[in-house]
Amino acid sequence: MTFSVEQVRADFPVLNREVNGQPLVYLDSAASAQKPEAVIGAEAEFYRHGYAAVHRGIHTLSAEATARMEAVRQQAATFLNAGSAEEVVFVRGTTEGINLVANSWGNANVGAGDNIIISEMEHHANIVPWQMLCARVGAELRVIPLNPDGTLQLDVVPGLFDPRTRLLAITEVSNVLGTENPLAALIALAHQHGAKVLVDGAQAVMHHPVDVQALGCDFYVFSAHKLYGPTGIGVLYARSELLQTMAPWEGGGSMIATVSLTEGTTWNQAPWRFEAGTPNTGGIIGLGAALTYVSQLGLTQIAEYEQTLMRYALDALRAVPDLILYGPAQRKGVIAFNLGQHHAYDVGSFLDNYGIAVRTGHHCAMPLMARYQVPAMCRASLAMYNTTEEVDRLVAGLQRIRKLLG
């Protein structure tokens, strides 16, 4: 189908509101995307007419809710082209998915003297769990450095691997720079050395199709709320042969097969043994609606529109005097910048006065801020509902701020 940004915008109620007397320009989707009516309505309908506890009842509502939840598991598997629905674990989000792998697979497979490789551009969620694991077991955390343009120093990467490398944990798309990493080559290199690969897909799944089998990764994680879905729900994909060997890291209801005070506890099958307690079923229903929504629009069509918009935005922003852009020319989703020597918080506050929402701060990427020797950056993120007119308003706002602040 032909992509129409006007039709897409009509599906998002919040885009009709004003902020500080100005029409809202929402350029913070990389932090959390807005929700279409289809997602809002699906979750509301579930709570109005179909809510019940799943996997716990023989009555009709429970059976229906369970079937709907498991249908979304299959939908997520199809979305990622996983081998089966049983390779999909529902988690609270990308952060929990990474922590699950670190505390389950990591505790069993990483030991003293081993090493894990990450990159300098990672979000804290793909740094801190590995730091914690390395501290627990006496392993080493190795870091792929960046070039000045925000791409990986690929010539350094082979030298970081050795026979004790257990994992490469790498983002697909940087949440600050928009850098799209060459996953196929990195995954192949890691596997040559016997290491597993976890991909942080939080900033990727909304921008292009993802095929985990084609990538060959061992783990892949993403959050629904960046994919136009609800907060509090995400997906961990794990290859079946790995997931079947992993122990649960949280205990409680649903994740057990049997519990005995004298003989101990046995675990449920994967993936359910990783889903302790009552799940966020409403969020799962909303995730399913979000997957349906973007799939019907077509991620290839979305990618084409967004890349055209990105080129327009970069060209327009390069014309703003004193504007410092960070990241490579070819990027996805985000544009990080500073305006001269003015603090990012000041610039972001002025933009908010003009009805323009951008993110300011370290973006949960403090090592990356240190790499560029700045305390903070502004970040404008472009989603499928943004327009060239909104880019023009951002540019005009920055021009105005420059005149006001000097």
From Swiss-Prot:
N6-(pyridoxal phosphate)lysine sites (modified residues): 226
Major subcellular site: cytoplasm
MF annotations from Gene Ontology: cysteine desulfurase activity; pyridoxal phosphate binding; selenocysteine lyase activity
Entry's EC annotation: 2.8.1.7, 4.4.1.16
PROSITE patterns in the record: AA_TRANSFER_CLASS_5
Keyword presence, Transferase: yes
Record-annotated active site: 364
Catalytic activity: (sulfur carrier)-H + L-cysteine = (sulfur carrier)-SH + L-alanine; L-selenocysteine + AH2 = hydrogenselenide + L-alanine + A + H(+)
A GO BP entry: cysteine metabolic process
Gene Ontology terms: cellular component: cytoplasm
CDD domains assigned: SufS_like (cd06453)
Record's keyword annotation contains Nucleotide-binding: no
Cofactor(s) for this UniProt protein: pyridoxal 5'-phosphate
Family of the protein in this entry: Belongs to the class-V pyridoxal-phosphate-dependent aminotransferase family. Csd subfamily.
Its biological purpose: Cysteine desulfurases mobilize the sulfur from L-cysteine to yield L-alanine, an essential step in sulfur metabolism for biosynthesis of a variety of sulfur-containing biomolecules. Component of the suf operon, which is activated and required under specific conditions such as oxidative stress and iron limitation. Acts as a potent selenocysteine lyase in vitro, that mobilizes selenium from L-selenocysteine. Selenocysteine lyase activity is however unsure in vivo.
Subunit record text: Homodimer. Interacts with SufE and the SufBCD complex composed of SufB, SufC and SufD. The interaction with SufE is required to mediate the direct transfer of the sulfur atom from the S-sulfanylcysteine.
Protein name per Swiss-Prot or TrEMBL: Cysteine desulfurase
Organism, scientific name: Klebsiella pneumoniae subsp. pneumoniae (strain ATCC 700721 / MGH 78578)
